[in-house]
Amino acid sequence: MADKHLSTQFDSELNGVSSRVMELGGLVESQIRLAIFALSQFSAESADQVIATEASVNAMEIDIDRELSSIIARRQPTARDLRLLIAISKTTANLEPVGDEAEKIARMVKSIIESGSARSLPASELNVAAELASGLLRKALDAFARLDTSVAVSILKEDDQIDEEFDGFVRKLITYMMEDPRTISASLNLLFVAKAIERVGDHAKNIAECIIYVVKGADVRHSPMAHIESAAK
């Protein structure tokens, strides 16, 4: 009976910390969406809201890490439970930087607005990459909540699209700067925005790899897609 009671407590603690991670995920997802809106509308007000949220993201990361450390020290989990806790830790470590990237986008948007060249920049060219990255993050969070390896594999495949969009945008931006050197400073800010968007996709990919690790016990980092698909079955 005592063992069953301890098991129930442990399950409750696992569910609690998992819920906290999903709460953090929801917060950074809203941050990145607001940052993308700030970019599309060149809205300083929206950018300020993104920046103001960053402190909450950082505080939640610290709370989750503290809770994880406590659970591991007290429960000494094994096998899949331990893998889940490790994955939660790594997922948290990938969500917090998404908040950082959102803040970076917001600050770059404000710099572009202050430069007075917002409307002349090809910011709309980033729309596809931004929506892809935001969508991948949403899929990664949903897949993590359900521990769905098939969705995790699809995320790893789709991340390549964001990389392609980024490369294409860089080529266009270089051409734009060559045609009008006066826009170089503001264009570089837009380049930093593009890189931040690409990194959001990278963090979604990392979360997808964590899902496969929890469910299958396979570390698929830096692995070819054929191996990933086989490991996730």
Question: Could you say what each language-model-derived stretch is?
Answer:
Residues M1-K233:
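Cytosolic, long alpha-helical scaffolding segments
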